[in-house]
């Protein structure tokens, strides 16, 4: 199966996350009723206020805004790093319910690609060998669909391409970017 390109799509997000964040912050620091707080937020841009609150280290207000992304063309290895961010929700393409008979997508690391065409050809040949092993195990396990996929998948490499739908609140997204970007 050919290599796929990476793709990240923002599929949903909190409407007006800045205003929602500002509401959370103003609720912490202001007296009065909710109607007055909402009116304050509607009347002026909240960016400077949110930045000031963030500079004070009050980041919990970011947790009210969330963002959901669909990520394709990434390796299972990347997935292992991504899911270390536990203040997030993940739905991952299953290697049990999705059969890779006929070919699995995989990621070629840039360092291997940089070694030149011979190294890259060797890598592709190794992926083809793993595909053959996978299909061989499926057959030995009785081509029983999900049941044989479940055990055959253990020979698939960390480079195996996957998809993930993930949702993070703004605070965790900011933390994620500080570590991973």
Description of each model-found segment:
Residues 1-181:
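Family-specific signature for flavin-dependent thymidylate synthase
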């Amino acid at each position: 199966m050919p290599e796929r390109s990476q793709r990240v799509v923002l599929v949903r997000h909190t409407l007006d996350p800045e205003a929602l964040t500002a509401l959370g912050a103003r609720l912490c620091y202001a007296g009065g009723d909710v109607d007055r707080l909402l009116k304050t937020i509607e009347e002026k841009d909240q960016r400077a206020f949110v930045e000031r609150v963030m500079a004070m280290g009050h980041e919990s207000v970011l947790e009210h805004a969330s963002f959901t992304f669909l990520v394709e063309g990434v390796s299972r290895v990347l997935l292992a790093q991504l899911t270390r961010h536990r203040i997030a929700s993940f739905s991952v393409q299953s290697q049990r319910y999705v059969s890779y008979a006929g070919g699995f997508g995989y990621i070629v690391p840039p360092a291997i690609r940089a070694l030149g065409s011979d190294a890259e050809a060797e890598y592709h040949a190794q992926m083809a060998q793993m595909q053959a092993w996978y299909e061989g195990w499926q057959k030995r396990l009785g081509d029983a669909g999900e049941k044989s996929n479940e055990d055959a998948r253990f020979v698939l490499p960390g480079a195996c391409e996957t998809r993930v739908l993930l949702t993070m609140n703004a605070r965790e997204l900011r933390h994620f970017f500080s570590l991973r970007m």
